């Protein structure tokens, strides 16, 4: 697809090698921000942003590992340009979000990368009883260093296509269904075993109470295909699987200020090869939100669930954890938010190769504190400090990391 910018030259090209599409968005932002074009119900909202971050352990270097002369901390700078689109045509609602970033690391230039975040959605309606969503997303970014600590640039691409719909059978009953396809790929050869395609189908039925609360059940089937076999010594493993779920789904409006959400039930995963890795057990997630006052909000969450991960030694982890967050609006322009999180991950997917890989369990504690300031309706400034502590039974994978992020965003 051709991505040439308009002929009008708004300002000179800066030295950063951004994609052409990002500069098109910048030009569009200046043009649509002119007084003659601006409107309160603006459909297209371009924006630009800039951020500076410092992390004292970018690569997740383990405690007690001797790395003489190796750089583990770095300051990074991220420039971004994007556009948000929201358009309503009758009952139909169309939305799009496009974001392009350029991130540069001062001490680790080999990690410099261009990122993309593209999202499209059509919230469709047919009469008063049928509605749903049809959309797609694409995200390209640097993969996290949780389980991979090398200095090579490891870009991860995630693509998702989805469709869902609901039918209001009765004022008190709603039938819903959905399908999706998720594709994840890595650039780095060492991570190719983690490439996967997951296809999901879901069917649910909800009771809609007059109070606004809902209670229902849902069935979900997921097929996960790993095109590249995992090599562990002399073993060659196929991590493809089928997963079935039967869960209860509850959204309880306890009061006008308190809401409780629950999703939990039986989950069963069967692998195409090596049944010792199969899983069957209860999974659940609960979220509680409390608006304590007009300015203070509190969120509490707890979970026990299996999930995929960025690691080539396990097909899944069993994650159990809890988090506590709060948001405090000091004024119309100033907000403070923070979160405490504790999670334990059991690498159960390595059971088949216990003779090759040791049993592994990780515990992660994370604390964040942020400040957001909006001096004008278009400009947002932010600062965030964080501290992570990872403790692992796997040698060399226990490490702390502390960081600070300063960011800004201007929406035209």
Where are these regions (language model features)?
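Gram-negative and organellar
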Residues: 38-412
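Alpha-helical and His/Cys-centered functional microenvironments
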Residues: 7, 31, 50
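Sec-dependent signal peptide recognition
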Residues: 17-27
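N-terminal signal peptide c-region/cleavage motif recognized by signal peptidases
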Residues: 33-35
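N-terminal secretory signal peptides that target proteins for export/translocation
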Residues: 1-18
